[in-house]
Amino acid sequence: MLEPPKSYNEMLPMLHKATFITTFIFYLSLVIYGYMPLVGINAKYIPPIKDYEEFIKWILTFGILPIAFSIFWSVISGALDLHNNVAKIIGIRKVWDNYLIIKPLAKIAGVTRKLTNDESYKVMSKLYYPEIKELKDKHYVELFWNKVYYFWVFFEHTVIAFITVLLISLAKLTNLFSVTGSLNNLWLWVISLIAFNFLIFIASVKPRTESQVRQIPDDKI
């Protein structure tokens, strides 16, 4: 999980695993600091797993919720393509594609007008993706996925943290369950994650995307 992928297809399963781990740590912290109830489980329902029995017992001392929600969000990450769909909904993908890929390519081609949605789609599907796939120097591609992978890991964690904190806030306001921790600390964590994601994007993802675009030969554009 710590070694970055070299392609989008390599990234996906690694992203789902990373989401499981970051979510587990996050929900474990929520239970420890009084933001979520400790929901136990009867030991007879735990299957015997050789060499991991003590570890599993330790995990379940924090209740079933951290492991259950980690599995849930990991499945959501894969089944619903969480990072990609949320990025599209809030406009990150549109900004990323338009300003870091499509406009620079259009400028090289001498096109100054705004492209239509259909033209933008063709630039991405018929030019950018095929040409990047055919690049002989894979160094730029690998550097790109090195940075993008970590961006998506923290992006998915930010989405999950935001939804979770929102639900915990509603639970505290409606007395759905006992929340002893400060909501201010939770929202500060979410804001910090958003700021960190923005920093990763500006400092790493943006220059790597621009560098990759520059590798496309002018005569292909």
Residue ranges and their predicted role:
Residues 1-105, 174-194, 203-215:
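N-terminal first transmembrane alpha-helix
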Residues 9-23, 116-172:
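Loop-to-transmembrane boundary segments
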Residues 77-147:
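Charge-rich cytosolic interhelical loops and cytosolic tails of multi-pass membrane proteins
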Residues 164-168, 196-201:
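Membrane-embedded alpha-helices of multi-pass membrane proteins, especially ion channels
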Residues 182, 198, 218-221:
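N-terminal signal-anchor module of multipass membrane proteins
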